[in-house]
């Protein structure tokens, strides 16, 4: 019986977490496109080496949505992100790839 109750609590926690993530995406998307737009400007302006520094500075101070976004970007990979920018990927496309839109 205890195992059943524990399993039910676990399933409810997972369901609650998924709903929270679904609610975050509409709010997270514009924040992401704005941030990725800044990264696109850096890369296309020839400051590829500044992308990592910019993200490290921002993410060190981040909380809430920006912290979530930083986690998504780091999980995706900064090198992959730069590669997508150089391939002509838009901010909306890149944010979709990192599951922020």
From Swiss-Prot:
Residues 25-101 form the Saposin B-type domain. Residues 1-24 form the signal peptide. Disulfide bonds join 29-101, 32-95, 59-70. GO terms for biological process: defense response to bacterium. The keyword Disulfide bond applies. Transmembrane segments: none annotated. Its main location: cytoplasm. The keyword Disulfide bond applies. Keywords: Antibiotic, Antimicrobial, Disulfide bond, Signal. It is found in: Cytoplasmic granule. Monomer. Homodimer. Hexamer; formed during insertion in the membrane. Forms pores in the cell membrane of host cells. Has antibacterial activity against M.luteus, no activity against E.coli. Implicated in the cytolytic activity of the parasite. This is Pore-forming peptide amoebapore C.
């Amino acid at each position: 019986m205890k195992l059943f109750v524990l399993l039910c609590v676990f399933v409810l926690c997972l369901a609650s977490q998924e709903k929270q993530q679904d609610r975050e995406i509409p709010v997270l998307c514009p924040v992401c496109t704005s941030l990725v737009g800044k990264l696109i400007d850096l890369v296309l302006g020839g400051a590829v080496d500044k992308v990592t520094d910019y993200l490290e500075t921002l993410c060190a101070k981040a909380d809430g949505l920006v912290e979530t976004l930083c986690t998504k970007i780091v999980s995706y990979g900064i090198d992959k992100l730069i590669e997508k920018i150089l391939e002509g990927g838009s901010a909306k496309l890149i944010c979709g790839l990192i599951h922020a839109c």
